[in-house]
Amino acid sequence: SIQALCRRQHVSLTNVYRVRNGDEYQFDDVNIKIFGGRHTENARGVYLPSEWDDDVESLDSELGWFGSLELQQYLITANDGSSVLIWGGMTTPDQKYRLQNLHPDLAILHLSPKQEPDVFGEMVKFIGPKVVIPHHYDMTKPLFDSNPVLLDRMLSAEQRAKYIVDGKFDEKAFVSAFANAIETWCPTAQMLRIEHHKWYQFGLAYAEEGSKPQQ
């Protein structure tokens, strides 16, 4: 939770905004809207520990819980109208309706093998972004490679059948399943697989009907 994080890191609360679903903050140059999220699903369920683990690296520590019941999503809109959606968590049934018709220029979306690609693709259709950049997916293979027991703990038998090749989690098969789902459900959106340690510049473009976009 934010209180545990601020206490642990000894962060001044002067510039900390504790946000909840439905909040909206207007600043001089940006507007931020908050949408409630979920991070409480895996194959065996998620349960709060009876007591917190003192080891801050543990998933059962107060910090390791990562605010699973407090997860929030953010739509950030600049004064020029350009907008970015930051989304993480799980594709629970409420999410597509919470985020319906936001139409951000850029959607930075959490990919997880615990999600179903078609459910994810449908959510993207409801959101209606121009460009999708996935995040989180690149930590999945290192996590499973370092702790294989999590494959059974976090994934269903069907998910393991799709994404495990020769006993190892296959990141390419995983990401491709979601890219294909986006192409099927929301062909107007483009999913970019960006590389680590590179800068990318995005700009606006226009196009007359039947012509190529002009910068």
Q: What is the predicted role of each segment?
A:
Residues D94, Q115-G121:
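A short, acidic, amphipathic alpha-helical segment used as a generic capping/interface helix at domain edges
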Residues S1, R18, L85-M90, L106-S112, ...:
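Active-site neighborhood of phospho(di)ester-bond hydrolases with catalytic His/Asp-centered motifs
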